Amino acid sequence: LQKKKSVEEKEDVTLSIVETAMAEELKASALYKRISEQLEDKAAKLKFDVMSNAEQKHYERLRKWYEESFGKIPEDKKIKTSKAVKIETPVKSANYEDVIKIIIGTEENACKFYEDAAKKTEDEGAKKLFETLVKMERAHVTQFKDEFRVMTEPSLLFAEEEIPWMLEV
């Protein structure tokens, strides 16, 4: 059982990292929700709703670690939105492809943030948490890069005879 530390006694950069990460996860969740609300395509809306929920779960995981480590929940003012990196918000005229590119960049930034956080923290529990979040964010990057590739490749590789139901009776 990890001994609870006082927030004031914590000398490590971990506290600041977790507070910033919490703010960023909330911001990402809100961005995906906003994008979803603006889309008409149901499959695209669902994808962004799922991403919004995933980012919310990342926030909840961070918050749980914070509560278990310090024995209290962070106050809103403790979440350092002022030092959080600005997420590029797509312009109103952005198409789906533009939005996917922004998301890839955002998720890559999250990977880098958590990789750096894992290197900087001296807290083993936090290090494990950050390494887990790197894997989750990396999965998001892969998912959207694959989708972008499928959208932008001029042709997918398959033979005409592989297409089902392309026959006459």
Pin down the residues of each PLM region.
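Non-heme di-metal
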Residues: 1-169
